[in-house]
A protein has these predicted regions:
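Charge-rich, low-complexity intrinsically disordered regions
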Residues: 1-128
Length: 128
């Protein structure tokens, strides 16, 4: 785990109207995110099956592993590191547009929507 102190040194802390505020450059923000994401467990076999372009890039030596791709690019591209099970009822309650898409036959399920678009769009798969 990345030590808190390592992150704290990377940001500017100030007080605004009695509240602590944290400021960071975009480049530093991305660096911190990549460090944190590098700690995520990646289901490497699933990742290679799910993302054929990544499998090709690994075979060509562009990336060392699925985990390396996820940490450097995949997370920022909105790729999932492993299969994530969706709470169908909750997801549809939170996302009426998805329920409507299912009704119209555009997607088969909340799970399919989440896998294809929802994760990348920042939708939650189950209650926080």
């Amino acid at each position: 785990m990345l030590p808190f102190e390592a992150i704290r040194r990377s940001v500017e802390v100030s007080t605004v109207r009695g509240q602590l505020k944290v400021g960071v450059s975009y480049d530093e923000f991305i660096r911190i995110i990549k460090l944190l994401v590098s700690l995520v467990e990646v289901d490497e076999a699933w990742y290679m099956r799910q993302y054929e372009d990544v499998a090709l890039a690994i075979r060509e030596g562009i990336f060392a592993s699925p985990r390396a791709h996820f940490a450097s690019n995949g997370y920022l591209e909105g790729r999932m590191p492993f299969p994530i099970l969706v709470d169908e009822q909750w997801y549809l309650e939170q996302n009426p547009d998805v329920a409507e898409s299912i009704r119209r036959g555009e997607v088969l399920s909340a799970q399919e929507h989440f896998n294809q678009n929802g994760y990348r769009e920042g939708r939650l798969p189950f209650p926080p």
